[in-house]
């Protein structure tokens, strides 16, 4: 039954605009929304709070399996971990970098696989991540791979963090994004790549609205 529920996967590197596009497309279609990156970031928060070593794969996998996460249904993008709002904590670069490292552990990815697939509920799902179309929902009828140059993605991230009042360096952000790209591409389990049947979109010169329209057209043209 579950595999008959339509899924649009939106994969791509950090800062490509996946989250903004996926949330907007889900709202337009009236579908459920999965931010898989937020799940890994929530695990990073939980590991820090529970004092679990970032090198202890089995303990991290057990922690991943125990996560109790709730995504806010509204546009505020609130995320609750064990009933505590962690929305502000998961947006830091430190959290993102730790999440990327934890995601390289096969046991962690396996523990979170069923949790992610559980978001596939009627009437449909828009799933945002790195391996949604290749590993988590390989049978999804609609797939997008959203990318942009490292420089453009770093500038977008820089502007986001400055708006939040954070003191950040554009050069440092660019280096971190390039390092995260390399780590995501080269990991042995579920490396970052476009699914063979995905529509590849370079958002470097596109507005947010243009990206949303292209994603919607992928669903509506079928």
From Swiss-Prot:
<dbReference type="InterPro" id="IPR003136">
    <property type="entry name" value="Cytidylate_kin"/>
</dbReference>
<dbReference type="GO" id="GO:0005524">
    <property type="term" value="F:ATP binding"/>
</dbReference>
<keyword id="KW-0418">Kinase</keyword>
<dbReference type="GO" id="GO:0006220">
    <property type="term" value="P:pyrimidine nucleotide metabolic process"/>
</dbReference>
<feature type="binding site">
    <location>
        <begin position="12"/>
        <end position="20"/>
    </location>
    <ligand>
        <name>ATP</name>
    </ligand>
</feature>
<dbReference type="GO" id="GO:0015949">
    <property type="term" value="P:nucleobase-containing small molecule interconversion"/>
</dbReference>
<dbReference type="InterPro" id="IPR011994">
    <property type="entry name" value="Cytidylate_kinase_dom"/>
</dbReference>
<keyword id="KW-0067">ATP-binding</keyword>
<comment type="similarity">
    <text>Belongs to the cytidylate kinase family. Type 1 subfamily.</text>
</comment>
<keyword id="KW-0808">Transferase</keyword>
<dbReference type="GO" id="GO:0036431">
    <property type="term" value="F:dCMP kinase activity"/>
</dbReference>
<dbReference type="InterPro" id="IPR027417">
    <property type="entry name" value="P-loop_NTPase"/>
</dbReference>
<protein>
    <recommendedName>
        <fullName>Cytidylate kinase</fullName>
        <ecNumber>2.7.4.25</ecNumber>
    </recommendedName>
</protein>
<keyword id="KW-0547">Nucleotide-binding</keyword>
<dbReference type="GO" id="GO:0005829">
    <property type="term" value="C:cytosol"/>
</dbReference>
<dbReference type="Pfam" id="PF02224">
    <property type="entry name" value="Cytidylate_kin"/>
</dbReference>
<dbReference type="GO" id="GO:0036430">
    <property type="term" value="F:CMP kinase activity"/>
</dbReference>
<keyword id="KW-0963">Cytoplasm</keyword>
């Amino acid at each position: 039954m579950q595999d008959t529920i339509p899924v649009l996967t939106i994969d791509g590197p950090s800062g490509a605009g996946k989250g903004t596009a996926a949330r907007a497309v889900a709202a337009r279609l009236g579908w459920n929304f999965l931010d898989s990156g937020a799940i890994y970031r929530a695990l990073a928060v939980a590991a820090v709070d529970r004092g679990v070593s970032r090198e202890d794969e089995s303990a991290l996998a057990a922690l991943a399996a125990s996560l109790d996460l709730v995504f806010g249904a509204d546009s505020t993008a609130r995320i609750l971990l064990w009933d505590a709002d962690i929305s502000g904590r998961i947006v830091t670069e430190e959290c993102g970098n730790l999440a990327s490292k934890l995601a390289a552990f096969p046991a962690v990815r396996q523990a979170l696989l069923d949790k992610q697939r559980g978001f596939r509920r009627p009437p449909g799902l828009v799933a945002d991540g790195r391996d949604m179309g290749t590993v988590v929902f390989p049978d999804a009828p609609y797939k997008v791979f959203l990318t942009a140059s490292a420089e453009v993605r770093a500038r977008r991230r820089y502007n986001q963090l400055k708006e939040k009042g954070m003191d950040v360096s554009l050069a440092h952000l660019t280096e971190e994004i390039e390092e995260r790209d390399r780590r995501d591409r080269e990991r042995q389990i579920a490396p970052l790549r476009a699914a063979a049947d995905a529509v590849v979109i370079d958002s470097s010169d596109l507005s947010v609205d243009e990206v949303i329209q292209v994603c919607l057209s992928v669903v509506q043209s079928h």
